[in-house]
């Protein structure tokens, strides 16, 4: 355990002292409101009123200096006509601006970490969520077992605050942090209901994402710390995450738990064939070794959540499956490893033999049933997959209707071009194509048959099927065989940085 303590002492100087004058500068909140939030590609528009401006933010900061408390009551905002149109606007702007301020030191450390690892140039490509699938193709064909792990949400938002306690030593910082959360949570209750966390995350998107991401980074840093168990612990993307005040005692407790339950030490978990992949709150743990080791990792994660984060998780929520027999769902794809058998004729003198050679291949399949369920929820079809019209768009122009349908179809086609089998993708395109025709027919108060007959042709809808072929024909203008092979094969794009709403059907 001495090597852990020595390592943790190396980064003791990284503990943060936040500059509170910076937190109470009005231009920070103006920046958070005017630019960083509404134009962010990572955080969607949180719905601020268009009437608000930098002047409102300045008046709010002035009012904060004159108040004895930071959070103004809802009754006060209702009485004041200036704030009456949106009683949560003031706390929302402050909390989001506060998130911008506290992100600054951590983003600087992350940038320095990337520079040390010399991966800054390729950082943009690493942002693509599709970059994980080539890794699956290269590595998972050699693995045997996979486990779906969903990182549990903390039952109380105070746990998210406590994770920052290992980094920040200023008490006023946490008082300010709790004031933002107090408006949405009942702190008299020992357990915060899920609806409070949901409400808080929707109204304070960036603030909640900062707390939750820090909670996940805390979990992953401990996971990787114990996984490596060596003196060389400065992993490329996680070197900024190892400063902990009470970490040494937690490690000792985990060692005692495993020594008691499994009669082994932590060195048992040094598995060179373990692979860990995460996106948002879902992670994949895969290994080549026996299922006994995977079970050890399973109970290790449960104990980690229970003793370090005080989050209860049932063992039955983590399933361990064999890759050759079960599929795992990740990033909108169903993936599994199947064996392709190929016959090879071998001849020796006058005798000939036929030998079957099995090669493992990763299959990525479009989950047609969940995707149809998402289309039905968005009113493009019914639960059986039969296309229906979109009444909300029937009052728009023809160009707007066609453009919206084409955009959705292109996005789905772009995302699912890595599928091993394109039949399900064609079915989704057909649903959207027919839904577009029915919406246009509804707008013109006609039947589908009469609308198409009056139109005389449906060539203007052929883009639903020919877009990929046209793109690939520009790349390979003289190689028709190469074009057909690529169109039928898998294509991964490095410009996809988030999941489409229809794809994210969980």
From Swiss-Prot:
Major localisation: plastid
Q: Which InterPro entries match?
A: Domain_X (IPR024937), Maturase_MatK (IPR002866), Maturase_MatK_N (IPR024942)
**Keyword presence, Chloroplast:** yes
Q: Which GO terms describe its molecular function?
A: RNA binding
Q: Where in the cell is it found?
A: Plastid, Chloroplast
Keyword set, alphabetical order = Chloroplast, mRNA processing, Plastid, RNA-binding, tRNA processing
Q: Biological process (GO) annotations?
A: mRNA processing; RNA splicing; tRNA processing
- Gene Ontology, cellular component aspect: chloroplast
Q: Which Pfam families match?
A: Intron_maturas2 (PF01348), MatK_N (PF01824)
What functional role does this protein have? Usually encoded in the trnK tRNA gene intron. Probably assists in splicing its own and other chloroplast group II introns.
* The family this protein is said to belong to: Belongs to the intron maturase 2 family. MatK subfamily.
HAMAP family in the record, alphabetically?
MatK (MF_01390)
| Name under which the protein is recorded | Maturase K
């Amino acid at each position: 355990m001495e090597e852990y303590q020595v390592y943790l002492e190396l980064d003791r100087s990284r503990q943060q002292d936040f500059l509170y004058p910076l937190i109470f500068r009005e231009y920070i909140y103006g920046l958070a409101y005017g630019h960083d939030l509404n134009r962010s590609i990572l955080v969607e528009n949180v719905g601020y009123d268009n009437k608000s401006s930098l002047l409102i933010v300045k008046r709010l900061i002035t009012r904060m200096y004159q108040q004895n408390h930071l959070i103004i009551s809802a009754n006060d905002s209702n009485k004041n006509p200036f704030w009456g149109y949106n009683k949560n606007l003031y706390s929302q702007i402050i909390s989001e601006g506060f998130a911008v301020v506290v992100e600054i030191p951590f983003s600087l450390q992350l940038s320095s970490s990337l520079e040390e690892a010399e991966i800054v140039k390729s950082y943009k490509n690493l942002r693509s969520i599709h970059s994980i699938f080539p890794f699956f193709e290269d590595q998972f064909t050699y693995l045997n077992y996979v486990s779906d792990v969903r990182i549990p949400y903390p039952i109380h938002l105070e746990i998210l605050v406590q994770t920052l306690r290992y980094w920040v030593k200023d008490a006023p910082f946490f008082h300010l942090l709790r004031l933002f959360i107090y408006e949405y949570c009942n702190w008299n209750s020992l357990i915060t209901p899920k609806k409070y966390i949901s409400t808080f995350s929707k109204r304070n998107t960036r603030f909640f994402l900062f707390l939750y991401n820090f909670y996940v980074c805390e979990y992953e840093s401990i996971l990787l710390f114990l996984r490596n168990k060596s003196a060389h612990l400065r992993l490329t993307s996680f070197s900024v995450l190892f400063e902990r005040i009470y970490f040494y005692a937690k490690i000792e407790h985990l060692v005692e738990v495993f020594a008691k339950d499994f009669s082994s030490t932590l060195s048992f978990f040094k598995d060179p064939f373990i692979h860990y992949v995460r996106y948002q709150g879902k992670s994949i743990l895969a290994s080549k070794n026996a299922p006994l080791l995977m079970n050890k990792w399973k109970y290790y994660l449960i104990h980690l959540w229970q003793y370090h984060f005080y989050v209860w998780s049932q063992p039955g929520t983590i399933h361990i499956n064999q890759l050759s027999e079960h599929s795992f769902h990740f990033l909108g794809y169903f993936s599994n490893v199947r064996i392709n058998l190929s016959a090879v004729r071998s001849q020796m003198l006058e005798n000939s033999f036929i030998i079957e050679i099995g090669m493992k291949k990763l299959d990525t399949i479009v989950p047609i049933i969940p995707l149809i369920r998402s289309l039905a929820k968005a009113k493009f079809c019914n639960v059986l997959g039969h296309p229906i019209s979109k009444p909300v768009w029937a009052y728009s122009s023809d160009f707007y209707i066609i453009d919206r349908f084409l955009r959705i179809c292109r996005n789905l086609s772009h995302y699912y071009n890595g599928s091993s089998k394109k039949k399900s993708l064609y079915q989704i395109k057909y649903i959207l194509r027919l839904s577009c025709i029915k919406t246009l027919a509804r707008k013109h108060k006609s039947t589908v048959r009469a609308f198409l007959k009056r139109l005389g042709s449906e060539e203007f809808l052929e883009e639903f099927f020919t877009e990929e072929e046209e793109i690939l024909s520009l790349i390979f203008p003289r190689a028709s065989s190469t074009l057909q092979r690529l169109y039928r094969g898998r294509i991964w794009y490095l410009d996809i940085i988030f999941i489409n709403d229809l794809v994210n059907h969980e």
